[in-house]
């Protein structure tokens, strides 16, 4: 699909979104509906349509053909809406309790109609307020273990996988990730964004040849290792949760990539939240980091034993070893890019006072660099956490 809208594309409004829900038969025509645009992202409009009388709601998400923050001078493919709805449906085949149900999708209108999750909160916001989400890591570990196994070479016949990979060809959004995660933060690039007090530490990143070689190696893995269907943007802002329930959303960056990518991104975002905390308040994040890896290994291994193709059955140990090494490296890239790159996170940017924020951002750069440079030496998740704790003392 073109990067710009097709002739059938029409941008929804609150009134036309509500009318669409009725037209689809998701509400009765006599229902009294409210509709609010609630999206806080940069790439989509998100409408919450609600029938107060019957206490029933749904979400209508529409991709827009440009980045809101820039406007129409930065066109974006609306095919990402098809990618997102297809990924949610695929993920729902294996973990229906961990993703929103998709009720309807329209490729031309770039619309996905899905389950209302307004009873949950974005996990990043809750974590920043000190919530623990006791089931978060177990749920995400299960999500990773099942979704990453069942779309891989280890579970699928080669022809089936090739057809699936074609369906999830996602060049524009992969290019965004390549630039913002693996390239621009490691150069003195105009898109980078950081406090002037961090410049000497950013320059340390840019002048570290070993670190840049590591980032280039990880970029090559990201671009060339089409192991499985990955979410592509799995951070704490892409997860709704409460104390009991977890739902992974926003897989519009989905593509066939390395098993370790989603794992590394999620772990890095747990550690970014740990950097926003002090002392013993970090322990829940350490627990989540260990638990998500351990649960992933358990779930992935169980699926492997049950459903791995016979010709690949002997490869489990090597597959997990490579996934761990790459996840550590990808986590390092995520820590660095969220500190000095274009797209920041509130976990770091809302730390007060200012001097403390700068110190924590220095730590993020230091830890990220260590993970990239030493990913082959770190063999267990406890070693990853030990190196983090060694640097974060107060």
From Swiss-Prot:
<keyword id="KW-0028">Amino-acid biosynthesis</keyword>
<feature type="binding site">
    <location>
        <position position="44"/>
    </location>
    <ligand>
        <name>ATP</name>
    </ligand>
</feature>
<feature type="binding site">
    <location>
        <begin position="115"/>
        <end position="117"/>
    </location>
    <ligand>
        <name>ATP</name>
    </ligand>
</feature>
<keyword id="KW-0486">Methionine biosynthesis</keyword>
<dbReference type="GO" id="GO:0046522">
    <property type="term" value="F:S-methyl-5-thioribose kinase activity"/>
</dbReference>
<dbReference type="GO" id="GO:0005524">
    <property type="term" value="F:ATP binding"/>
</dbReference>
<dbReference type="InterPro" id="IPR002575">
    <property type="entry name" value="Aminoglycoside_PTrfase"/>
</dbReference>
<comment type="pathway">
    <text>Amino-acid biosynthesis; L-methionine biosynthesis via salvage pathway; S-methyl-5-thio-alpha-D-ribose 1-phosphate from S-methyl-5'-thioadenosine (hydrolase route): step 2/2.</text>
</comment>
<feature type="binding site">
    <location>
        <position position="337"/>
    </location>
    <ligand>
        <name>substrate</name>
    </ligand>
</feature>
<dbReference type="InterPro" id="IPR011009">
    <property type="entry name" value="Kinase-like_dom_sf"/>
</dbReference>
<feature type="binding site">
    <location>
        <position position="61"/>
    </location>
    <ligand>
        <name>ATP</name>
    </ligand>
</feature>
<dbReference type="GO" id="GO:0019509">
    <property type="term" value="P:L-methionine salvage from methylthioadenosine"/>
</dbReference>
<feature type="binding site">
    <location>
        <begin position="250"/>
        <end position="252"/>
    </location>
    <ligand>
        <name>ATP</name>
    </ligand>
</feature>
<keyword id="KW-0547">Nucleotide-binding</keyword>
<keyword id="KW-0808">Transferase</keyword>
<dbReference type="Pfam" id="PF01636">
    <property type="entry name" value="APH"/>
</dbReference>
<comment type="function">
    <text>Catalyzes the phosphorylation of methylthioribose into methylthioribose-1-phosphate.</text>
</comment>
<keyword id="KW-0418">Kinase</keyword>
<comment type="similarity">
    <text>Belongs to the methylthioribose kinase family.</text>
</comment>
<protein>
    <recommendedName>
        <fullName>Methylthioribose kinase</fullName>
        <ecNumber>2.7.1.100</ecNumber>
    </recommendedName>
</protein>
<dbReference type="InterPro" id="IPR009212">
    <property type="entry name" value="Methylthioribose_kinase"/>
</dbReference>
<comment type="subunit">
    <text>Homodimer.</text>
</comment>
<keyword id="KW-0067">ATP-binding</keyword>
<feature type="binding site">
    <location>
        <position position="233"/>
    </location>
    <ligand>
        <name>substrate</name>
    </ligand>
</feature>
């Amino acid at each position: 699909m073109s990067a710009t809208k097709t002739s059938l594309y029409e941008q929804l409004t609150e009134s036309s979104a509500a009318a669409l829900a009725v037209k689809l038969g998701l509400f009765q025509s006599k229902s009294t509906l409210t509709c609010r645009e609630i999206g806080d992202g940069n790439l989509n409009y998100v409408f919450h349509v609600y029938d107060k009388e019957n206490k029933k709601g749904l979400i209508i998400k529409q991709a827009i053909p440009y980045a809101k923050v820039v406007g129409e001078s930065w066109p974006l493919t609306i095919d990402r809406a098809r990618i997102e709805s297809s990924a949610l449906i695929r993920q729902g085949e294996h973990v229906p309790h961990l993703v929103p149900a998709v009720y309807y999708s329209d490729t031309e209108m770039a619309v996905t109609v899905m389950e209302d999750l307004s009873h949950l909160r974005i996990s990043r916001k809750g974590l920043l307020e000190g919530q623990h989400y006791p089931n978060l890591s177990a749920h995400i570990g299960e999500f990773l273990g099942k979704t990453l196994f069942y779309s891989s070479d280890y579970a699928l016949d080669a022809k089936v996988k090739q057809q699936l990979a074609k369906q999830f060809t996602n060049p524009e959004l992969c290019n965004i990730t390549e630039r913002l995660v693996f390239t621009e933060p490691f150069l003195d690039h105009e898109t980078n964004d950081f406090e002037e007090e961090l410049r000497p530490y950013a320059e340390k990143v840019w002048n570290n040849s070993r670190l840049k070689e590591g980032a280039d190696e990880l970029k090559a893995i990201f671009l060339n290792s089409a192991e499985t269907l990955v979410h592509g943007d799995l951070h704490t802002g892409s997860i709704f949760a409460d104390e009991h329930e977890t739902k992974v959303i926003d897989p519009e960056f989905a593509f066939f990539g390395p098993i370790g990518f989603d794992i590394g991104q999620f772990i890095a975002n747990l550690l970014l939240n740990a950097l926003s905390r002090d002392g013993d308040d970090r322990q829940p994040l350490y627990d989540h980091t260990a638990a998500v890896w351990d649960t992933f290994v358990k779930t992935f291994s169980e699926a492997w034993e049950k459903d791995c193709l016979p010709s690949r059955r002997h490869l489990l140990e090597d597959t997990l070893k490579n996934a761990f090494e790459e996840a550590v490296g990808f986590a390092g890239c995520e820590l660095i890019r969220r500190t000095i790159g274009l797209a920041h996170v509130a976990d770091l940017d809302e730390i007060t006072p200012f001097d403390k924020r700068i110190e924590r951002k220095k730590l993020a750069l230091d830890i990220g660099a260590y993970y990239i440079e030493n990913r082959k030496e770190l063999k267990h998740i406890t070693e990853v956490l030990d190196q983090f704790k060694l640097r974060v003392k107060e």
